[in-house]
């Protein structure tokens, strides 16, 4: 673990114009989290003395209140480069302490590589995270003389000869705040972008006779940055592959890994099976022997053991008990709670509904703002009419109730246990004792009636 005396500065002030979006670049999503969220979580795992985040928008990003450790937000009102952004952060630091600089658009940097970087700092004034790559386009190049780092040249300022250099700079480094302040105050804006480049401090450190150490990350993917939607898409693929490989190694059966999308966190038991085309988002919990059929979307929900989620079912913000059968083509919306051995069938939609043990809603029904007892059977086409155009009301159905097909339950309403409701009934009043509930509907006949005939148009 790194020392707690380190201060982490995250640079997130870039406008991200190449994303061609109204949203800040670092607030685009990668693997179910914002790009910036990945970086902050890594920083948080190191347990630093402080995290300082430099941003450009007048309004703080929505992440400002998420994390337990406080984040100090510093605005860079005008885009004057990374050197200027780091100097703004250091001005808020009173003592001479170790500074780690991370970037808000480099999401895969690992705590292990940061630990290596900090360890190497003990041997130098400044330690850089670098890598040797086949295609260095877009990155600053490491310039060496007799093996020693003497400076960094940005891609847009590099000569043709310098552009052939394969060793690149990630932008991530560690140095003492006192040294950084001295170097940053000496840099200028004589470059293509007319900005203060943080990379210029390397040449200054060299001129002072400082030894500059370089460390490579565990893998090249850790220093990949995001500047456009293509790069975001490529990193999403990398993220998905890593997450899926972890699940496979940990015993989850994924029948078609190339068509499984996982954006968030997954806790799982043994013998979990996931079919093709499944999407899991946010925080998902799958118990032992859970089976997820093809095309399902499960978002921020928990599913207990031995439950079978059949094809093309959507489950959102819900909790499913043991031994349930859901789907196919069911939609369990927010705050659906199912007890044990509940069956939700084809084209059933639920919301804000609690269904107790062994109840069945097998066809073409809607249950909203409802509490359903145990061993209840809801017939096809039954609807809880919970909304009057302004307010929503609750339907409460007791144990062992049989609701016939095509029934409308006009909320607020309560149905006593052991009641039977005949098919086609509209229930408008509470049923307080067990009985048969039905509407009298006279069946009529019209004799000598004939169907209409098609009119044949003449040309």
From Swiss-Prot:
Which Gene Ontology cellular component annotation is one that this UniProt entry carries?
membrane
Q: Spell out the disulfide connections.
A: none
Q: Which reaction does it catalyse?
A: alpha-D-glucosamine 1-phosphate + acetyl-CoA = N-acetyl-alpha-D-glucosamine 1-phosphate + CoA + H(+); N-acetyl-alpha-D-glucosamine 1-phosphate + UTP + H(+) = UDP-N-acetyl-alpha-D-glucosamine + diphosphate
Can you tell me which residues bind Mg(2+)? Answer: 105, 227
Q: Which InterPro entries match?
A: Bifunctional_GlmU (IPR005882), GlmU-like (IPR050065), GlmU_C_LbH (IPR038009), Hexapep (IPR001451), Hexapep_transf_CS (IPR018357), MobA-like_NTP_Trfase (IPR025877), Nucleotide-diphossugar_trans (IPR029044), Trimer_LpxA-like_sf (IPR011004)
* Spans annotated as Linker: 230-250
Q: What is its EC number?
A: 2.7.7.23, 2.3.1.157
Give an example GO molecular function: glucosamine-1-phosphate N-acetyltransferase activity
Q: Which residues form the active site?
A: 363
Q: Where is this region: N-acetyltransferase?
A: 251-459
* Associated pathway: Nucleotide-sugar biosynthesis; UDP-N-acetyl-alpha-D-glucosamine biosynthesis; N-acetyl-alpha-D-glucosamine 1-phosphate from alpha-D-glucosamine 6-phosphate (route II): step 2/2; Nucleotide-sugar biosynthesis; UDP-N-acetyl-alpha-D-glucosamine biosynthesis; UDP-N-acetyl-alpha-D-glucosamine from N-acetyl-alpha-D-glucosamine 1-phosphate: step 1/1; Bacterial outer membrane biogenesis; LPS lipid A biosynthesis
Alphabetically ordered keywords of this record = Acyltransferase, Cell shape, Cell wall biogenesis/degradation, Cytoplasm, Magnesium, Metal-binding, Multifunctional enzyme, Nucleotidyltransferase, Peptidoglycan synthesis, Repeat, Transferase
SUPFAM superfamilies annotated for this entry? Nucleotide-diphospho-sugar transferases, Trimeric LpxA-like enzymes
Keyword Transmembrane (UniProt): no
Q: Which domain of life is it from?
A: Bacteria
Question: Which cofactor(s) are needed, names only?
Answer: Mg(2+)
Any one Pfam family here would be: NTP_transf_3
Tell me which residues bind acetyl-CoA. 380, 386-387, 405, 423
Q: Which family does it belong to?
A: In the N-terminal section; belongs to the N-acetylglucosamine-1-phosphate uridyltransferase family.
The UniProt entry, under HAMAP family, shows: GlmU (MF_01631)
Its biological purpose: Catalyzes the last two sequential reactions in the de novo biosynthetic pathway for UDP-N-acetylglucosamine (UDP-GlcNAc). The C-terminal domain catalyzes the transfer of acetyl group from acetyl coenzyme A to glucosamine-1-phosphate (GlcN-1-P) to produce N-acetylglucosamine-1-phosphate (GlcNAc-1-P), which is converted into UDP-GlcNAc by the transfer of uridine 5-monophosphate (from uridine 5-triphosphate), a reaction catalyzed by the N-terminal domain.
- PANTHER family assigned: BIFUNCTIONAL PROTEIN GLMU (PTHR43584:SF3), NUCLEOTIDYL TRANSFERASE (PTHR43584)
> Can you name this protein?
Bifunctional protein GlmU
Name the gene: glmU
């Amino acid at each position: 673990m790194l020392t707690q005396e380190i201060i982490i500065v995250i640079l997130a002030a870039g406008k991200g114009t190449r994303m061609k979006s109204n949203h800040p670049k670092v607030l685009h999503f990668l693997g179910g989290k914002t790009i910036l969220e990945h970086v902050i979580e890594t920083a948080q795992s190191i347990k630093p003395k402080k995290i300082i985040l430099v941003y450009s928008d007048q309004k703080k990003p929505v992440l400002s209140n998420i994390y337990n450790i406080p984040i100090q937000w510093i605005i860079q009102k005008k885009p004057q480069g990374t050197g200027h952004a780091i100097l703004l952060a250091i001005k808020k630091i009173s003592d001479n302490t170790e500074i780690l600089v991370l970037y808000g658009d480099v999401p895969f940097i690992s705590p292990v590589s940061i630990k290596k970087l900090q360890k190497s700092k003990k041997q130098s004034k400044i330690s850089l995270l670098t890598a040797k790559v086949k295609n260095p386009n877009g990155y600053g190049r490491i310039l060496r003389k007799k093996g020693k780092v003497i400076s960094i040249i940005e891609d847009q300022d590099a000569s043709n000869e310098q552009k052939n250099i394969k060793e690149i700079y990630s932008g991530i480094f560690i140095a003492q705040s006192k040294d950084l302040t001295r170097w940053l105050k000496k840099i200028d804006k004589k470059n293509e972008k007319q900005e203060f480049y943080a990379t210029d401090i390397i040449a200054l450190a060299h001129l002072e006779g400082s030894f500059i150490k370089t460390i490579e990350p565990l893998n090249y993917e850790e220093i990949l940055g995001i500047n456009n939607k293509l790069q975001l898409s490529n990193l999403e693929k990398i993220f998905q592959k890593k997450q899926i490989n972890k699940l496979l190694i940990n015993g989850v059966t994924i029948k078609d890994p190339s068509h499984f999308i996982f954006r968030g966190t997954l806790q799982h038991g043994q013998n979990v099976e996931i079919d093709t085309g499944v999407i899991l988002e946010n925080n998902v919990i799958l118990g032992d022997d859970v089976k997820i059929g093809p095309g399902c979307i499960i978002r921020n929900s928990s599913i207990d053991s031995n439950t079978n989620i059949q094809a093309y079912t959507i489950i959102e913000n819900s909790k499913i008990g043991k031994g349930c059968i859901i789907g196919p083509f069911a939609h369990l919306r927010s705050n659906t709670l199912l007890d044990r051995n509940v069956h939700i069938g084809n084209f059933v939609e639920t919301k804000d509904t609690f269904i107790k043990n062994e109840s069945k809603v097998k066809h073409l029904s809607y249950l909203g703002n409802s509490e359903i007892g145990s061993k209840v059977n809801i017939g096809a086409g039954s609807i809880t009419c919970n909304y009057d155009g302004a307010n929503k009301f609750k339907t409460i159905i007791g144990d062992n109730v049989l609701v016939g097909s095509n029934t409308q339950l006009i909320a607020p309403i309560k149905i006593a246990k052991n009641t039977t409701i005949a098919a086609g009934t509209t229930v408008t009043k509470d049923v307080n004792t067990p009985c048969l509930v039905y509407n009298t509907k006279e069946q009529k006949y019209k004799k000598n009636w004939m169907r209409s005939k098609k009119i044949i148009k003449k040309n």
